[in-house]
């Protein structure tokens, strides 16, 4: 195949645009959210979650309400909820990994946190079996990730698993 200068430029341009655009989308699919949640759950012997479009629709609707100010304010809705914020393009996988990193603060034997661990305990909450997540780019360029859990978890004095 013989490429002209313009053809070579076009091929390189398309490849670069694809390399810049695809990674941000590649870690925001329902399968991506489920994979990282279920890895964390499996590590402590908790069964997998299933994607639930009804729960995801709730997450999308609420995340859209946060687009204007990008503040991490919980919805107070019917589901368990984890929120994450990034100043740029935060992926869903990165958000879930931040929540899972709180495992280091959780003492299962005492069922206590040494620091923040409530996001982690919601991720691994045994009775939460349906998941829905959403990502919204805020007006200020930041990103909000919202994951909702059905049924909700994090009940006082109850271990997650």
Swiss-Prot record:
Disulfide feature: 70-138, 113-117, 133-147
Mitochondrion is among the record's keywords: no
Signal peptide region: 1-26
GO CC terms: apoplast; secretory vesicle
Induction, per UniProt: By 2,6-dichloroisonicotinic acid (INA) and salicylic acid (possibly an endogenous signal for acquired resistance). Strongly induced by pathogen infection.
Pfam families xrefs: CAP
Keyword Secreted attached: yes
Compartments where located: Secreted, Extracellular space, Apoplast
Alphabetically ordered keywords of this record: Apoplast, Disulfide bond, Pathogenesis-related protein, Plant defense, Secreted, Signal
Family: Belongs to the CRISP family.
Purpose of the protein: Partially responsible for acquired pathogen resistance.
Name of the protein this chain belongs to: Pathogenesis-related protein 1
């Amino acid at each position: 195949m013989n490429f002209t200068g313009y053809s070579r430029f076009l091929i390189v341009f398309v490849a670069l645009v694809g390399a810049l655009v695809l990674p941000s989308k590649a870690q925001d699919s329902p399968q991506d959210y489920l994979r990282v949640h279920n890895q964390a759950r499996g590590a402590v012997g908790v069964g997998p979650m299933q994607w639930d479009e009804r729960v995801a629709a709730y997450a999308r609707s609420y995340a859209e309400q946060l687009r204007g100010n990008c503040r991490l304010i919980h919805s107070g809705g019917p589901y368990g909820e984890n929120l994450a914020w990034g100043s740029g393009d935060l992926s869903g996988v990165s958000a879930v990994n931040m929540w899972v990193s709180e495992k280091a603060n959780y003492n299962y034997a005492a069922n206590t946190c040494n620091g923040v661990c409530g996001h982690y305990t919601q991720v691994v909450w045994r009775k939460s079996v349906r998941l829905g997540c959403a990502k919204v780019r805020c007006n200020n360029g930041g990103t909000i990730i919202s994951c909702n859990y059905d049924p909700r978890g994090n009940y006082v004095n109850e271990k997650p698993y």
